[in-house]
Amino acid sequence: MAIGMSELKKGLKIELGGVPYRIVEYQHVKPGKGAAFVRAKIKSFLDGKVIEKTFHAGDKCEEPNLVEKTMQYLYHDGDAYQFMDIESYEQIALSDSQVGEASKWMLDGMQVQVLLYNDKAISVDVPQVVALKIVETAPNFKGDTSSASKKPATLETGAVVQVPFHVLEGEIIKVNTETEEYLEKVK
């Protein structure tokens, strides 16, 4: 199915020249003279490279043959991440470059979406919100009551996020994996 220029948005998956891409950033430009166009940064699912591409009015791109499968993250064994299909129990391995930034949010046993392109695993998407335990953060000090103040906190996966001063080591918090921002404590 063809995708028109007006349908482009961040996160959309497209195919150009037989290669699947994800739109990382886009900007709709209306110059004083001439036709409007979209300037986009797109990231290849196959090699991870980001390129800049300009789409003009009337340009079309194809929707890639991508299938999302729910899988369980099992473990990381040095150079590969192991996943198991929760329906067939088949296991697959993905490299560090294929997993990318998702690795800092993954816990053993977590369900993730593995993206398949022509039946080959190429990428992993974690849930937009995850609950993780804080393993290290600075202690509270009397007087740290400003809600605008933040401190770094290391999570059980190794990711570091900024949290309010009232959040303590050992607590479980919810984090937005796209913006890498603290959302709230888990009750």
From Swiss-Prot:
Example GO BP: peptide biosynthetic process
Keyword match Iron: no
Pathway given in the UniProt record: Protein biosynthesis; polypeptide chain elongation
GO molecular function, one term: translation elongation factor activity
Cellular component, GO annotation: cytoplasm
Subcellular locations according to the entry: Cytoplasm
Location (main, coarse): cytoplasm
Pfam families according to UniProt: EFP (PF01132), EFP_N (PF08207), Elong-fact-P_C (PF09285)
Keywords, comma-separated and alphabetical: Cytoplasm, Elongation factor, Protein biosynthesis
Keyword Plastid applies: no
Family stated for the protein in its record: Belongs to the elongation factor P family.
Function field: Involved in peptide bond synthesis. Stimulates efficient translation and peptide-bond synthesis on native or reconstituted 70S ribosomes in vitro. Probably functions indirectly by altering the affinity of the ribosome for aminoacyl-tRNA, thus increasing their reactivity as acceptors for peptidyl transferase.
Protein name in the entry: Elongation factor P
Organism encoding this protein: Helicobacter acinonychis (strain Sheeba)
